[in-house]
Amino acid sequence: MQCPSCQNTDSRVLESRSADAGKCVRRRRECLNCDFRFTTYERVETIPVTVIKRSNAKEIFCRSKLLNGLTRACEKTSINNQKIEAIVDEIETHLQQSNLKEISSVDLGEMILLHLKSVNEVAYIRFASVYRQFNGIEDFIDTLESFKPSNKFAAIS
């Protein structure tokens, strides 16, 4: 590992520990040339997942883009940043564990909606309105109907 101070490649590891819930290793190092101490993180290299957009354009999955979209949908709700990060982590983990090389933006959006539906209805509606490109009040009403409990005896007087 190259020293950030003198660029020497000889260093020794002073301490190693698991970090980021076991997803990486944090190492404290010391340069053998200048005694500068620095921290490195070792992570498993993952194969990037390509998102196929509605226009058939392709782009690499971007965690920050997903995080920003969820944060906007969850503004002024009871969902805190830790929960948003946890949702993004779950989706990212699912993508890596499924060994998908590509995923459609439609499938990705449905995964997000599935998480939001069980967490917060307002965030779900906000995200769905953008993701599903609502054109009017009917789209909102149809989506809101999915939250009503299906009770076949409710209509009987």
Swiss-Prot record:
Domain ATP-cone: 49-139
Pfam family, one: Zn_ribbon_NrdR
Entry protein name: Transcriptional repressor NrdR
Domain of life, per lineage: Bacteria
Keywords assigned by UniProt, alphabetized: ATP-binding, DNA-binding, Metal-binding, Nucleotide-binding, Repressor, Transcription, Transcription regulation, Zinc, Zinc-finger
GO biological process: negative regulation of DNA-templated transcription
Cofactor, free-text remark: Binds 1 zinc ion.
Molecular function via GO: ATP binding; DNA binding; zinc ion binding
Cofactor or coenzyme needed: Zn(2+)
InterPro entries: ATP-cone_dom, NrdR-like_N, RNR_NrdR-like
PROSITE patterns: ATP_CONE
Annotated family: Belongs to the NrdR family.
Organism: Prochlorococcus marinus (strain SARG / CCMP1375 / SS120)
